Amino acid sequence: MSDDFNDRRRRPAAFSVEAEEAIEREMEQTPRRAPGSFSEKVVMTPDAEDPFIGTTAAVESLNLPEAMPRRRRLSFGKIAAGAFGILISLAVGLWIDRLVRDLFSRADWLGYGAVAVVAIGVIAFLIVVAREVFGMMQLTAVQTLKADLAAAAASGKTQAARAATARLVHLLAGNPRTAKGRARLAETEGDIIDAPHLIELTERELLAPLDREARRIILGAAKRVSIVTAVSPRALVDLGYVIYESARMIRAMAELYGGRPGTLGLLRLMRDVIAHLAVTGSIAVGDSLIQQILGHGLASKLSARLGEGVINGLMTARIGIAAMDLCRPMPFRALKRPSIGDFLGDLAPGTARSEGSAG
């Protein structure tokens, strides 16, 4: 066996190595660049006269601070709505009771049929209410988990970080995009990792594929809004489609990150997104901002409708980023938060090329 092993060994071979003198000689023969100087005085262009700084400032002004859910507090409007809701429910109940009694007075089978219909309606209504309550609780659980992860990273307690990351793994267990990340985290259960690094590892392994999918969802919605705005004949059609696409995008974002909102949950998310945009003053885009963004060769080539399509697409992207902040179960730490500049090149390629040539 040892003889066979010796036969399989690589036979000795010879190869030439360049001498150090030859290498040094080759380096000496390489021509060196002679020192040079500027013939004219270098003049620094101030920011006020820079023709390209306007575009950068315009794009940066489109970026939003991270969206946070609004604080829920009891207001007089909610008290009034609850009181009138109870009153309307009692009125509906009395009307149904009177209707069933009248049907019984006419014929027993009509009365029993009405009772059966009312029972089916009540059961269906309770199921709908249960689903809505579960959806609202799921959204609240996501925000609670987000706060717990941030607190665990700030405190540095490994046990709290382990418990919070385990809850995150359980939340995303049904998403096949996180299978590889969950397996990777399972391998580190016995390792000694401090809390900030454990949370950053969890973010990279679990949320990186979800963030890529979220960016794809936002970009797809923004492109569809841009196309519809460019070809639609009426502004009302634009507004209706933007609302429809935004609601669809927000629901997809919530489902991607583990939330399953019902109708009330979706309305709550949309209200939080709109409130965030309103507070930051980011709902409307002025004509000067449009000219700054589309001014480098693109506005002169595109029609006004196409320019409006690009702007509406950017507004949709801002709504998507705000929805991503609200639905994501972790704050951005190890991964970069998306910005409007990430979508500007896809929505307006000419602008990206102009900025690249300017740089």
Curated annotation (Swiss-Prot):
The record's section on InterPro entries has: DUF697 (IPR021147), UPF0283 (IPR006507)
Keyword Ligase in the entry? The reply is no
What is the superkingdom listed in this entry's lineage? Bacteria
Q: Name one GO cellular component term.
A: plasma membrane
Report the transmembrane regions from the record.
76-96, 109-129
- Keyword hit for Disulfide bond: no
Q: Where in the cell is it found?
A: Cell inner membrane
Q: Report the sequence similarity comment from the record.
A: Belongs to the UPF0283 family.
Q: Report the protein name in the record.
A: UPF0283 membrane protein R01807
Can you name the source organism? Rhizobium meliloti (strain 1021)
